[in-house]
Regions:
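Conserved metal-binding segment of the jelly-roll/cupin
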Residues: 84, 123-140
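Non-heme Fe(II)/2-oxoglutarate
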Residues: 1-72
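Short beta-strand His + acidic residue motifs that chelate non-heme Fe in jelly-roll/DSBH
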Residues: 92-94, 138-146
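A short glycine-rich, His/Asp/Glu-containing loop-to-beta-strand
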Residues: 67-86
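A short hydrophobic beta-strand segment most commonly corresponding to one strand
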Residues: 104-106, 147-158
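Short beta-strand segments enriched in hydrophobic/aromatic residues
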Residues: 81-83, 108, 157
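A short beta-strand-loop-beta hairpin characteristic of the jelly-roll/cupin
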Residues: 87-92, 99-101, 107-126
Length: 158
């Protein structure tokens, strides 16, 4: 059900992906919620693909990740950036799509934030690790306390 692969992308290629996404000129956009309108969290987001369209000039940067997943059809590709907090706490269980597809989370940097599934399984945020699971499996990210930011690439696909 949940599959985990470490060093998912060739390490030399991953260095470039990380450098681009975590670079000071990468366009992140403030989002006043994390899970749903009115929650107490915020994050910065970047849509690479949404509503059947490539929405970012940076799509080519993450294309090798998409190719390696053997995607037949994309639903959404989004980068999430959260900032350091004073204690680790979950954001809230949720699903990313209102229908059954696949979800993959690629961790762009290592930090002490985790992904928790409704099954109780916990996945550490370690760079270049990917976790793949059915989109109807509820999950939550958490805050982190050790790095300035936590960055993940969230991919929903068939």
């Amino acid at each position: 059900m949940i599959k985990i692969k470490e060093n998912f992308v060739d390490p030399f290629l991953f260095v470039d992906i990380k450098k681009q996404i975590m670079g000071k000129y990468f366009p992140w956009f403030y989002n006043d919620c994390k899970i749903e309108e009115g929650d107490e969290h915020f994050q910065f987001i970047h849509f690479f693909y949404k509503d059947n369209l490539v929405t970012s000039d940076y799509f080519k940067v993450i294309k090798p990740v998409i190719d390696k997943l053997n995607v037949k059809s994309l639903v959404r590709v989004k980068g999430n950036l959260t900032t350091k907090d004073i204690k680790i706490k979950p954001f809230g269980l949720h699903t990313d799509a209102p229908f059954k597809c696949k979800t993959a989370i690629l961790y762009i940097n290592t930090n002490n934030g985790i992904t928790i599934f409704e099954t109780g399984e916990e996945i550490k945020s370690e760079e270049n690790k990917i976790v793949m699971y059915p989109s109807n499996l509820k999950h939550t990210g958490t805050t982190h306390t050790d790095e300035k930011v936590r960055v993940v690439l969230n991919i929903n696909y068939f």
